Amino acid sequence: MKKSTVIVLSLAAFVLLSVMQFSAAEDIKMEVEEQRGYCAEKGIKCHNIHCCSGLTCKCKGSSCVCRK
C-alpha cells in the first residue's frame, strides 16, 4: 500500500513539474519575440509576430490581422 502511494505521488509530481517547465518555456519564447522590437501595425498579418501596443491579433478563418 505504501509503495503504490509513493509511486503515484512521484508520478504526479513529475507530471506537474513537466507542465510547469513547458509553460515557462512558452513564456520565455514570447518575451524574446517582444524584445526584438518587431511588431505588426493595424491591418498587418500577425501570425508570427505580436501586434504593436493597443492592438490585438484577431482571426477570421485562417487570416489573422492586428486590430483595435
Swiss-Prot record:
Coiled coil: none annotated. Belongs to the neurotoxin 33 family. The keyword Transport does not apply. It is found in: Secreted. CDD domains: Spider_toxin. One of its GO terms (cellular component) is extracellular region. Keywords: Disulfide bond, Knottin, Secreted, Signal. Expressed by the venom gland. InterPro entries: Spidertoxin (IPR004169). Residues 1-25 form the signal peptide. Disulfide bonds join C39-C52, C46-C57, C51-C66, C59-C64. GO terms for molecular function: ion channel inhibitor activity. The presence of a 'disulfide through disulfide knot' structurally defines this protein as a knottin. This is U4-agatoxin-Ao1a. It comes from the Eukaryota. Residues 26-36 form a propeptide.
